[in-house]
Swiss-Prot record:
Transport keyword on record: yes
E.C. number(s) listed in UniProt: 1.14.12.17
Protein name as it appears in the record: Flavohemoprotein
Domain notes: Consists of two distinct domains; an N-terminal heme-containing oxygen-binding domain and a C-terminal reductase domain with binding sites for FAD and NAD(P)H.
Gene3D superfamilies for this protein: Globins, Nucleotide-binding domain of ferredoxin-NADP reductase (FNR) module, Translation factors
Residues with site note (Involved in heme-bound ligand stabilization and O-O bond activation): 29
Organism this protein belongs to: Bordetella pertussis (strain Tohama I / ATCC BAA-589 / NCTC 13251)
Cofactor note: Binds 1 heme b (iron(II)-protoporphyrin IX) group per subunit. Binds 1 FAD per subunit.
Amino acid sequence: MLSPEVRALVKATAPVLKEHGEALTRHFYTRMLGGNPELRQLFNQGHQQSGQQQQALAAAVAAYAEHIDDPSVLLQVVERIAHKHVSLGVRAEHYAIVGKHLLASIREVLGEAATDELIDAWAAAYGQLADLLIGRERALYAAAASRDGGWTGWRAFKVVRKTPESAEITSFYLAPADGGATPDYLPGQYVSVRVYVPELGLMQPRQYSLSEAPGMPGQLRISVKREAGSPAGMVSGTLHNRINEGDVLDVSPPQGDFTLDAEDGRPVVLLSGGVGLTPMVSMLNHLTARDDGRQIRFVHACREAGVHAMKEHINALAAKRPNVRKAVFYERVGADDRRGVDYDYEGRVDLHAIRDEVILPDADYYLCGPLPFMQAQRRALADLGVAEHRIHAEVFGTGGVA
């Protein structure tokens, strides 16, 4: 338990961290990865080069300082971080390394303002946060290992099937190389996949949603969008261009707190943008397999027909089941695109225009996609009277999955 004096000192640094947080985190990563180059394989080097990782850490450190009097406000964030850490293989011993370089960076960046008293306060605050994360991660590791077919760390999986879903998205069907079982998981969860990236000379992990419902015997499926450019697309490009059927990938156990609550029977509205449809398809397949008659809406946005993944599968489910309705938006409609078959609406997703279809009593809303898409849909749902606790979201990007 932190003393009132420690909490006051840490909280007093929140404005400074908001102003200088990115300088601090840039210095921190340079210092830590320079002294511990083996850790480069834990971190997304694309996000390191773009600055996204530094921005995310700066925001997290400032938020922790701001809410140090009541860190329970940040429990959802802590839960999300813990799941990602377990998928990456972060261990308790890594926290000592991070703490050493974080405290040294605070002293070096803040200069004379970083008194011994302030550094001691931040050491205590960091210790509290580290203990919280280590404890939660220990429980997640134990749960992953105890499931039938479960494991911890990296496990070799063979690509048994590689299927294009659109011009940008390809599905990889993965089976354990040891011939063993795969564990059950929750719709919406993800795995980390680790590949060697020759351009970096490093193993690099990325998180990919499991795009099929739980229960596929002996296999897991991920559906990967080819990201443009470098460094953003280094891993997805490797998967698309260099990984073929028969090749072996390192895969983590399923993790993630963005999951479907299917037990209460409430209506479900699934809203996705681009490759954000991958966890939604897992949720949709799970719900339709349950066949409990609840109302289900599948709303999807994509740029055009060429990048519309899994169209035939979604159309078939909607045609077969009267409780499932779809609303697909194309930003650009081609001359050969058929309304009601290929797409349903032209332009960007407009929930106000389809409010009679998607605003259902007591419904749960699941959102996944790029940040601007997510922000727009959250605002629209709030405008339409949907309670905040009914909205569940996963952002694809830093801190999220892809």
